């Protein structure tokens, strides 16, 4: 599809409908363990997954569509259509001058962690498959402007690799997983252990990126103070997420994963790019000081590995773009983060003009759409 606006957003979220899993899974087999929306005693509605109410102060995250950006829906009747209906989403994309949208979940967790936390592996696998099929059957089927990505069951490396193959075979263009699978589900190996190598090998073979959305690894971020109200907590959470992405890039490099799997492409959306120069400079410094080439067999500088295999995303920041040549203009993607409160919607064009005012045309096109088109193999 030819570009109309010259913008691809690589991090937007869909809202799963309340009956997604209940209409696709056996109530006789799974009962109330099926993910579903349940009215609470106070009249609000919340997602309940495997019998556990999902933590959070809302049913959905749609702040970009609220009048003050701070309020979130408490019942399904308050959820805007553009977050769950592809046709309404396309209208929102047109109004905000967005050509393509790479999709992430919401109720399932930004990286599928809410589904990944399910202890029963068979239930976890079935829930992941239902979500992945829905994305293809409803969103991808609505037109080529939606770029589908699959969540994977993390309770078993074998199951994760199998679902990755099945989902990509159906048309998914990326894979999503939590940044700390072992803390999401005790049955999962630590991300940096070689038990995950069969998955990395499958991802290389499938030739799709693996994506670690910011916020899916809370253990590597500062805790939110219990003294904060909901609005302040949301602001703090958005700022702290860069620390999580920096730690994940650090770990993916120093663990040797990206040295062993040289074709693996990793995306770190949702945390901006300002932190990247510090992270790369610190990694290179420690690589030299700790003699990691000699002692650990990490024969290339970490920054070289990053420039070969990692992507980061920008949306709100101007300062980070001034360091684009150190980060690598070919390693930066643009995102809207629709429909979350931190999204550029409905002012994406204005913010792009402001943030990219001193970026040359070639680099601007790289970041706004060419890199994403290459990564997701889009015919544009």
Residue locations for each model-derived region?
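Glycine-rich, proline-tolerant flexible connector loops at the mouths of alpha/beta enzymes
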Residues: 105-119, 179-187
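Surface-exposed, active-site-proximal loop segments in enzymatic domains
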Residues: 69-74, 109-123, 155-158
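Di-metal (Zn2+ and/or Mg2+/Mn2+) metal-binding site signature of metallo-dependent hydrolases
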Residues: 13-14
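Short aromatic-enriched loop/helix-cap "lid" or pocket-rim segments at secondary-structure transitions
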Residues: 19-22, 113-116, 222-225, 278-282, ...
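Short, solvent-exposed turn/loop segments enriched in Gly/Ser/Thr/Pro and often Arg
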Residues: 10, 40-41, 104-110, 150-155, ...
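Mid-to-C-terminal alpha-helical segments outside catalytic/metal-binding sites
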Residues: 2-8, 17-72, 77-80, 84-100, ...
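Catalytic pocket-lining loop regions of alpha/beta-barrel enzymes
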Residues: 123-124, 139-147, 152, 158, ...
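Paired acidic/hydrophobic, glycine-rich loop segments that form the ligand-binding mouth/hinge
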Residues: 101-102, 175
């Amino acid at each position: 599809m030819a570009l109309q606006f010259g913008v691809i957003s690589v991090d937007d979220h869909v809202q799963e409908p309340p009956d997604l899993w209940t209409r696709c899974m056996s109530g006789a087999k799974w009962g109330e363990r099926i993910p579903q929306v349940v009215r609470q005693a106070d009249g609000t509605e919340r997602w309940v997954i495997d019998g556990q109410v999902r933590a959070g102060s809302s049913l959905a995250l749609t702040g970009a569509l609220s009048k003050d950006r701070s309020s979130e829906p408490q019942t399904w009747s308050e959820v805007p259509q553009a977050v769950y209906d592809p046709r309404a989403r396309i209208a929102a994309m047109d109004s905000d001058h967005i050509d393509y949208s790479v999709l992430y979940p919401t109720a399932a967790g930004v990286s599928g962690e809410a589904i990944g936390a399910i202890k029963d592996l068979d239930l976890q696998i079935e829930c992941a498959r239902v979500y992945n099929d829905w994305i293809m059957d409803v969103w991808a089927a609505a037109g080529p402007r939606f770029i589908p990505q699959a969540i994977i069951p993390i309770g078993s490396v074998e199951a994760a690799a199998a679902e990755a193959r099945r989902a990509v075979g159906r048309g998914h263009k990326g894979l999503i997983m939590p940044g700390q699978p072992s803390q999401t589900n005790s049955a999962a190996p630590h991300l940096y252990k070689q038990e995950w190598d069969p998955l990395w090998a499958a991802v290389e073979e499938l030739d799709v990126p693996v994506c670690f959305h910011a916020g899916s690894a809370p253990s590597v971020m500062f805790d939110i103070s219990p003294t904060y109200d909901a609005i302040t907590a949301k602001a703090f959470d958005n700022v702290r997420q860069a620390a999580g992405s920096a730690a994940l890039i650090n770990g993916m490099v120093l663990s040797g994963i990206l040295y062993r799997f040289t074709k693996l492409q990793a995306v770190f959306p949702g945390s901006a790019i300002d932190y990247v120069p510090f992270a790369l400079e610190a990694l290179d410094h420690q690589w030299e000081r700790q003699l990691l080439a000699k002692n650990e067999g990490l024969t290339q500088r970490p920054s070289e590995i990053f420039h070969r295999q990692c992507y980061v995303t920008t949306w709100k920041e101007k300062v980070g773009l001034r360091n684009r040549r150190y980060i690598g203009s070919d390693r930066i993607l643009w995102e809207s983060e629709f429909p979350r409160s931190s999204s550029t919607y409905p002012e994406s064009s204005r913010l792009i003009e402001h943030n990219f005012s001193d970026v040359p045309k070639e680099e601007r096109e790289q970041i706004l759409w060419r890199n994403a088109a290459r990564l997701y193999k889009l015919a544009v």
